[in-house]
Design a protein with these regions (language model features):
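Formylglycine-dependent sulfatase
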Residues: 16-201
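Bacterial Sec-dependent N-terminal signal peptides
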Residues: 1-22
């Protein structure tokens, strides 16, 4: 009986210690068409990426993995859902196939354990009025491009925040304009992190 009682006390102390710890913040970076050695921590002598290098030094690097698909939208679906390409809802890069309704994503799983979730940049898993928009798959906030074809312009006339168009002043959707979209996306991401600094994100 003493042995079982001691084991029970240990278990209670162990589990209370787990729940007392704060969940770590997660910054998940995905980049299209980035070669393995283009980052300076991988040995590139010409391109300097000190902030990403710091993430690599202090965080987790996945170095033994294969891409689930060779093109944008299917790969994004694989990474968001954790599914093999043969089971994923998005298998082509046509920009029209969305995530299925109620599809589990990394964001929806993190929401279940108390995380604030934000996505910034290119989504590629479903356009507005589809089952695949980010806010239907666990994201509190998404700001950027829903459609990867829309992302082919650095100066689009608008970006999207939770299915609502946000106008970018001085842009007509061409190769030049007044508002560089990536600066706006970066600002939105940094603002999200600053506002959520006291909660796990």
């Amino acid at each position: 009986r003493i042995r079982y009682f001691s084991a029970l006390i240990f278990l209670l102390l162990f589990t209370s210690n787990i729940f007392a710890k704060k969940n770590p913040n997660i910054v998940y970076i995905m980049s299209d068409e980035l070669a393995y050695f283009e980052l300076s921590h991988m040995g590139n002598k010409y391109i300097k990426t000190p902030n990403i290098d710091q993430f690599a030094a202090e965080g987790i690097r996945f170095t033994s993995a294969l891409a689930g698909a060779p093109v944008c939208a299917p790969l994004r679906c694989n990474l968001m859902t954790g599914k093999h390409a043969g089971h994923a809802s998005i298998r082509a890069n046509d920009g029209g196939t969305p995530l299925r309704e109620n599809e589990t994503t990394i964001a929806s799983m993190l929401k279940q354990i108390g995380y604030e979730t934000g996505g910034f940049g290119k989504w590629g898993c479903g356009g507005r009025d589809s089952t695949g928009v980010p806010e239907k798959h666990g994201f509190d906030l998404f700001y950027g491009y829903y459609d990867q074809v829309h992302a082919h312009s650095f100066y689009p006339s608008y970006l999207i925040q939770n299915s609502v168009e946000v106008e970018l002043k001085g842009n007509k959707g061409g190769r030049t304009g007044q508002t560089y979209s990536h600066y706006k996306i970066m600002e939105a991401g940094l603002n999200f992190i600053r506002k959520k600094k006291d909660k796990p994100f």
